[in-house]
């Protein structure tokens, strides 16, 4: 026996799909076949007959017919093929027969030779004729499960039915009136199996679209805590370690520069000759003076020696209100005045001989006067990198004392074993180098003597 053209076409499609085709796809094909070819002929005044149950499984069918009378039957759509299944309650068990549709659109029970034009005609036939080889006949149709006295309804425009009217009454049990106290309401249309299938498919598609449209909510990013360096220290205990390191580095660099300015003077000056101790101790009066420099050499006045600042002997200068430029100018004038006074009083002082420290300005003057070989004052060379050279050979060094710091600027010394702690936190800025400094800044005393002699001459 051969099925109808539509049934054969769908059967070939299922065979081409193979066993890998999902059950949902098979049911979709069967539903499409039923809606396009079978629904118009099955509907009775727009309503499905009570014996048609749509898509239910074999197990559900047996559970439904278990408590029914002998011969109770129903027709359902196959869940594994395109076609109908006839199920009825036999004497010992439930029996299932496949109903095929022929090319001439007639229905035939598998194993029989007699075909029928409609399913309703087929059922009436087997209510009178026994099904072979069991010898059993059909009795009454097994009704579908009704929900709250609602009946199924279907029409040809099923796909255009308003879905908003299909609201199950079981969702609102409190709103239903009591059957005993109130008159029975007119019956409402029940959602058929076709409506349910269409609703299920539409709800799946709508839920997929909604789930695709709704963005995934991302949890908010936790607020970042403020950094320690962004907060200003509120008290003396809130010390930031990076700032502390910067201060230590700045103090270390300042100490290195100060030690570099004092290193050359300490290497070449303040050196005593063997067998002689440095003469001159600070008296009580000199110690009480803030600007005292210690014992002045013989032939010098106290006010002349007091013009030298502390830095001439390598001591740190305490902070004052004067500007750094004026301090540097005063230091150079005092240094030149001390050097010229020492040269003028060389004959009067014979006990203590002082050596002049070599500077660029005095070195030029010493070259102009080469006849100072027999003078008790001699030039002491500056120590550069641990080597000392005498500008006038043949002169034995006696007692030397530093008259002032050399005008060499800053010199960085690497490899110092121990850095001294400077007593003054202010950085000393030396005066700018000038080759003609010694000649431009003449002492006021010689200038007065020079003009006085000219007056007397004229």
Swiss-Prot record:
Region of interest: Disordered: 204-235, 267-326
Residues passing through the membrane, by range: none
UniProt entry tagged with the keyword Cell membrane: no
Keyword terms, alphabetized: SH2 domain
Highest rank taxon of the organism: Eukaryota
Boundaries of every SH2 domain copy: 51-142
Comp. bias regions, Basic and acidic residues: 278-288
CDD domains: SH2_SH2D7
Pfam families per record: SH2 (PF00017)
Start-end of Polar residues biased regions: 304-326
Keyword Ribosomal protein: no
InterPro entries linked: SH2, SH2_dom_sf, SH2D7_SH2
Gene3D superfamilies, A to Z: SH2 domain
Protein known as: SH2 domain-containing protein 7
Organism: Mus musculus
Protein's gene: Sh2d7
């Amino acid at each position: 026996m051969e099925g109808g053209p539509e049934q054969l076409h769908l059967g070939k499609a299922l065979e081409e799909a193979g066993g890998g085709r999902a059950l949902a796809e098979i049911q979709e094909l069967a539903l499409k076949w039923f809606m396009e070819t079978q629904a118009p002929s099955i509907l009775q005044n727009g309503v499905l007959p009570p014996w048609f149950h749509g898509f239910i499984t074999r197990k559900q069918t047996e559970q439904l017919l278990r408590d029914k009378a002998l011969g109770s039957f129903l027709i359902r759509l196959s869940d594994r093929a395109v076609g109908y299944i006839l199920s009825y309650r036999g004497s010992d068990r439930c029996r299932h027969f496949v109903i095929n549709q022929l090319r001439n659109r007639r229905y035939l029970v598998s194993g029989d030779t007699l075909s029928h034009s409609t399913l309703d005609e087929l059922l009436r036939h087997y209510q009178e004729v026994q099904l072979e080889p069991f010898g059993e006949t059909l009795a009454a149709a097994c009704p579908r499960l009704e929900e709250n006295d609602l009946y199924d309804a279907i029409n040809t425009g099923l796909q255009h039915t308003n879905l908003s009217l299909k609201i199950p009454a079981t969702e609102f049990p409190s709103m239903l009136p009591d059957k005993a106290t109130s008159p029975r309401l007119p019956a409402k249309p029940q959602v058929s199996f076709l409506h349910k299938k269409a609703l299920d498919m539409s709800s799946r598609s709508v839920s997929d679209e909604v789930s695709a449209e709704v963005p995934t909510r991302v949890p908010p990013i936790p607020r970042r805590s403020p950094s320690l360096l962004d907060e200003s220290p509120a008290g003396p205990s809130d010390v930031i370690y990076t700032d502390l390191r910067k201060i230590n580095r700045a103090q270390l660099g300042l100490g290195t520069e100060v030690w570099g300015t004092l290193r050359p003077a300490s290497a070449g000056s303040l050196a005593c000759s063997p067998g002689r101790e440095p003469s001159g101790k600070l008296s009580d009066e000199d110690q009480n003076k803030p600007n005292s420099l210690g014992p002045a050499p013989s032939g010098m006045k106290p006010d002349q020696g007091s013009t030298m600042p502390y830095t001439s002997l390598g001591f740190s200068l305490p902070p004052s209100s004067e500007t750094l430029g004026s301090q540097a100018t005063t230091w150079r004038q005092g240094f030149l005045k001390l050097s010229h006074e020492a040269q003028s009083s060389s004959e009067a002082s014979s006990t203590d001989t002082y050596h002049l420290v070599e500077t660029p300005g005095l070195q030029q003057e010493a070259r102009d006067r080469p006849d100072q070989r027999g003078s008790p004052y001699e030039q002491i060379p500056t120590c550069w990198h641990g080597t000392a050279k005498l500008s006038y050979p043949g002169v034995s060094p006696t007692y030397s004392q530093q008259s002032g710091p050399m005008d060499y600027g800053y010199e960085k010394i690497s490899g110092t074993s121990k850095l001294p702690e400077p007593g003054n936190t202010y950085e000393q800025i030396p005066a700018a180098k000038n080759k003609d400094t010694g000649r431009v800044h003449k002492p006021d005393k010689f200038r007065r003597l020079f003009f006085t002699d000219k007056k007397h001459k004229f």
